[in-house]
Structures are given as structure tokens and as C-alpha cells.
Amino acid sequence: MAQVRHLLGSTPGHRGLRLRIGVDPGGCSGYTYKLALVPGAETGDVVLPQDGFDVVVHTTGVDLLRGMRVDYTETLTSSGFTFANPNAKSSCGCGSSFGSSDDPERTAADAKLPRTQVEEIMEEIRPMLRGDGGTPRSSPSSRGRSAGSAEVHLRLTGACGGCSSANATLTGVIEARLRQQLPEIGRVALVA
């Protein structure tokens, strides 16, 4: 809240500004978070009074954001708002995109491939890639439950995204580890 108050105080004409929190379809996991300073509430907004300012959320996003916590974090390499959303059934390394069981396409994929297991394995792999400045984001896309029939789509970002060794990283590290742990995975593919 302190960072929002600071932003409001340093914005010319800040009186009456509110923090709008919302979601848009898209991103690497299904939805992306939106934050904006806005002059007022609109028709269909829910207004949530905070300590010194109001948060507004349009009613269409309330169910996806209910119970979410927004924090501001600073590290040696970055700073920004972070989201802890109990409605997020999946998320990506960027921290600004999430998947929800309300997304029918994502729900179908999750039902066919154990996304939680894929994500747990990816969490073991990510520190190795982060050491090189890269971050993989996974998205199960299944075509069946039998051994070797499911697919996992990966987006390599950061240094890995532009690296000429991305395919070697994919097959030598990520695909080998995923297929070892989850025999239903037949293919791991890079996506743009």
C-alpha cells in the first residue's frame, strides 16, 4: 500500500485517482494482470477502500481476483508489484500471467496432463536456467493419457529465448527430465 500511496502522491493531479486492478485474456498462462491509476470508478466497478486510496475492480474480474494479495517487492535486480492469487491454478515465470480453472481450454489440458507435476519438475529445472539468465514457461497441451501421447509447450525467455543453444537445452535438459518423470509426455516443443 505504501508504494501505491507514493505513486499517487507523485502523480500530478493525483486527487481522486484510484488503483484499478484487472485481468485481460492472454499471456502465457491464460490471463494477464493489469494495474492502472484511473480518475474514478466506472459503471460495473466494485470499489474497495484501502488506507488512503480506493482500489477498483470491474465485476467481470472479481471472481478471478477474489482473495488476491498484491505486494511491492524490491531486489538487487528488479522491483515491481507481485501477485499472490488463490484463484490461479497455474502461472508462469514472468509473474504477470496466470491460468484459472475458469478457462475451458486450460481446464481440458489440465485434466489430461498433471500440470502440477509438470510445474514441480520445471521448478527443479528453473534455477539452472536462471543461472544463465533464462526462464522457461510451460504449458501442458495434451492429446491423450496413454504413454507418450501428451505434449508440453515451452517458451524460453530471457537469455535462453535468444540463445542458439535453446534446442539443446530443451532436449538435453528439460525434455529428458520431464519424460523421465512423466512417461505420458511424448513431446516437448518450443513455442514463440
Swiss-Prot record:
Biological process annotations from GO: iron-sulfur cluster assembly; nitrogen fixation
Keywords of the record: Nitrogen fixation
Compositionally biased tracts (Low complexity): 135-150
Classification via Pfam families: Fe-S_biosyn, NifU
Family annotation (NCBIfam families): iron-sulfur cluster assembly accessory protein (TIGR00049)
Function summary: May be involved in the formation or repair of [Fe-S] clusters present in iron-sulfur proteins.
Protein name (record): Nitrogen fixation protein NifU
Source organism of the structure: Frankia alni
Taxonomic placement: Bacteria, Bacillati, Actinomycetota, Actinomycetes, Frankiales
Gene responsible for this protein: nifU
